[in-house]
Amino acid sequence: MRNVTILAACLFTASVSAAESNGEYIARISDCVACHTAEGGAAMAGGKKFPTPVGDIYSTNITPDKAQGIGNYSYEDFEKAVRQGIAKDGHPLYPAMPYPSYAKLSDEDVQALYRYFMHDVTPSAQPNKENAIPWLLSARWPLHIWNWLFTDAPATTVDSAKPDDNAALVKRGAYLVEGPGHCGSCHTPRGMAMNEKAYTHADAEYLSGAMIDGWYAPSLRGSGMSE
């Protein structure tokens, strides 16, 4: 009986380690560190400035620190922030956070991501910075309407791909590009409401090239890429 208990504990530990490893993989693909790390600041501790048409937005601390970060987030809180753009206290996040793309993340990948942030990311008490947005433009309630218009229902599962299954590999690639990779955030043109005009390769505008912060993100749809 003791041996069975030890074996079960080892298998559980191995599964947890695998989940956290996959969580780091998803975090890297999602490029969380690029937006949530300020120059000279702690990794994932936020504070990076993003100029927008309505003012400057600062990324938040997403380390597991309980005072400044997300250490008090349950999995349900985390999932809602990542895939629906809703913070723990219920306020909508600005879509500078690419949650319309992250809505495509599977339950399994979001769970792995949560484990990684809670167990492997180093906590930092670096304070969050206030956004520099004029008062009249700082109301968050219009973002609920924006979400209703421009986001999809969260995904739940995603098919795995075998090395010899080309169709499955293409599907897996689409998942990585459209979901965690959020390639469309830069390479898809935006509408009047700053929404991406498409979120899937089925739409011709998806990854068709766009201007962003004064530079041009070229089309990734294949035409001319080999030239």
Segments the model singles out, each with a brief description of its role:
Residues 1-17:
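Gram-negative bacterial Sec-dependent N-terminal signal peptides
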Residues 13-28, 147-178:
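Electrostatic cytochrome c docking/interface patches
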Residues 24-56, 84-92, 120-125, 178-213:
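Periplasmic/extracellular electron-transfer cofactor-ligation site
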Residues 27, 78-81, 116:
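Conserved hydrophobic/aromatic "anchor" residues
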Residues 37, 42-68, 96-100, 149-159, ...:
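Sequence context of c-type cytochrome heme-c attachment sites
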Residues 52-79, 100-110, 201-227:
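Electron-transfer interface patches adjacent to heme c in soluble/periplasmic c-type cytochromes
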Residues 89-105:
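A cross-kingdom feature marking solvent-exposed beta-strand/loop segments within repeated
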Residues 125-143:
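Extended, well-folded interaction surfaces typified by the phenylalanyl-tRNA synthetase beta subunit core
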